[in-house]
């Protein structure tokens, strides 16, 4: 059963509201309500992540696949964190560079540990971690 929408008022300084309207317009929002709801959800996900609650997300890394020691180290790290890895996708960006997208679900601290271990490997050119709600 879906929650019933509840209307409430928000008071803001004029300058802050103008900045907010500019921001949500650039982000493609049609109305303030959806933008505010998304910002609230984003903060809740951040709070869950920081407190070690269950999150889902993706770790992305770019590396040179010709450097075998990098590939082997990345695989070892992934196997060491198998309990939180849902899947991994390997993409050939060009002749030298590969993109790995690793889908994860687990405690925020474990997800952060995996992301930190992967990005610290010498030869990883770029790494990002994106987290969202696990749906619960």
PLM feature spans:
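Short, solvent-exposed charged binding patches
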Residues: 56-136
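Short Lys/Arg-rich basic patches
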Residues: 1-11, 24
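Solvent-exposed alpha-helical segments within well-ordered globular domains of core cellular machineries
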Residues: 18, 22, 34-38, 72, ...
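Short amphipathic alpha-helical segments
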Residues: 8-12, 20, 30-41
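Short, charge-rich, low-complexity interaction segments located
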Residues: 36, 45-52
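Alpha-helix boundary/capping and short turn/kink residues
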Residues: 26-29, 108
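Conserved, well-folded catalytic cores of nucleic-acid-processing
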Residues: 42-47, 77-80
